[in-house]
Amino acid sequence: ENSDVLEEFDRVLRFWFDRGIDGFRIDVANSLVKESGLPDLPENEKFGELVGDSPMWDQPELASIQRRWRAIADEYADTPEGPRMFVAEAYLPHDRLVRYLESDRLHTSFNFEFLISAWKANSLRTTITESLAAHESVGASATWVLGNHDNVRPVSRYGKEISGLDFSDPSAPHAQFHGTPTDVALGRCRA
């Protein structure tokens, strides 16, 4: 609600877009605004677990902020460098996550439902089917996250055998994000 903060974000986005970056990853995209009155977060007996119904998640003001940022990104659609984009980082179930991916909000997101799914055919099938349906409902591409810096490395979780899954097919109906290759020698260590 502070116009100075909103305008500073506008300036920062334009600064980097003007220099040709492709986009931004919005960390904890569902927690950029806290409930009015700034109430305390409920106590959580298990340190590190997210409190689902708290004053810092999914606040209505997020929509206007994300629409404001999207409008700025859309200003660059016809530039020589091409369109700009936003990627949401938020650990949310599909039905809540895709609200952030409506056509006038963020472009896509990391799909952590896939990351936390059991490594079993039925579980993966359900996760993939639900994810594709949810993303299709808002016209966004689904992504498939196997690992990140918050979780044990995939090689430790899934074993060292070659998997039958191939996420490198560019014709598949999902987006691909490739970060720094993981080092198998690190084993269970996080990035």
Residue ranges of predicted features:
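Active-site and adjacent substrate-binding regions of carbohydrate-active enzymes
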Residues: E1-A191
